[in-house]
Amino acid sequence: MAYFPLFVDLEGRQVLVVGGGKIAMRRVRTLLEFGCEITVVSPEVCEELREKVLWKKKRYDETDLESLGNVGEASRFIFVLAATAPEVNEKIVCDCRKKKIPVNNASNRDQC
């Protein structure tokens, strides 16, 4: 599969990160530089994440995508990052694709 680099203005956009470990922290650190509003969904998160994001202390389910708003509005581009167990990532990728939400699976380049 060939990948096309994409530049997106993320300032003020909602970003959902699923997972609260080291991979999620690296992604969040980078995204914060671009002015995103970040929500993390995970039963546990590293302490540094707690201070920088809105944390939903729970396991992911499909309603987490619905809570982000209407993805059809051009002004509310939503980019979802998945950084957890492979089976959870697979579900998130499927859920996002059904709803036409751009998704990046940090652990599987084929699902970007």
PLM features: residue spans?
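Generic hydrophobic alpha-helical segments
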Residues: 49, 61-64, 92
